[in-house]
Amino acid sequence: SRSTIGASSKFTDFSIPKITRKNVSGLSYRLMPSDRWNVSAFAKYYRQYNKGPVSQNTDGIGNYINLSNTASALGYGAADTYFIWKDLQVKLSYEKAFRLPTTDELFGDEDLEAGKMNLKPEKSDNVNLSFSYNHQFGKHELYAEAGLIYRDTKDYIKRGLDVLGGTSYGYYENHGHVRTKGYNLSLLYSFSRWFDIGGTFNSIDTRDYEKFLAGSSLQESMHYKVRMPNLPYRYANINANFYWNDLFVKGNVLSIGYDSYWQHDFPLYWENLGDKDSKNMVPEQFSHNLSLSYTMKNGRYNVSFECRNFTDAQLFDNFSLQKAGRAFYGKFRVFFGK
């Protein structure tokens, strides 16, 4: 369905080279006042150079010229961990972070994704607090973790949908202010070298905090404090693995694995618009995968087989586009190192 005219499509110009270079440099300092207390501080320097087609039209499509830009930023943060007692640890961290745009966000996919070469990096203030518990009793081990997340983001890179000439396409833009709050829970149990089972649950609430419409200081946005569209906000996974050590030959391992992913249904567009009963939704989905692998010579050789989505459930991406159904994979790996 690509619409091509000469060396151009609706969403890009193939004759203009597309270049991006990312560099991230970091420096950290760690202090251990005691065996139970650990403090670290760090700084990161981000730099990105982009060169490629930029549209001169107001809708960002067509009439491309070749332009370049460079973005740089300094991020920093600190983290603190403390053992309340032997098996219980608390972690607290803060980071002034930046997320550089990806290749698809900058240049699209040259088909049905329109990139935006002059996207700004996302900048955010991130705070994380978590408690973790790890206890061993005989051949058994239990690990549990609970965490809180807070993220205040400016220039949030948002993907949207539009229609041009009867063709739907995706596009990217910087959205002024977004705030994220949430929590995650994890639990893992393992028995010796034979078995483990675990799972995670996440609840992430991302909302629009841009109070006024772009270009206006008076008109309040109807999406203010409304959950951002196209983002799942409750999801979970479970995985279990069985290991048969020294099968046939000492050092060889047979492993059988199962994992699943659940995701609730969520609105395709802004949830405060449209009739509740007829609203476009990304459906709830629940997928299951199975894997079998045999490792030989202490990891030098590995043969694996996998069946993904073995129940052939209908799965969708964040824009309600259906993913592939049941699929089978095989892989053989050889490690040539010592």
PLM feature segments, named:
Residues F83-E95, P121-K181, N202, D208:
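Membrane-embedded beta-barrel scaffold of Gram-negative outer-membrane proteins
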Residues S1-W85, L100, L213:
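Signature of Gram-negative outer-membrane beta-barrel scaffolds
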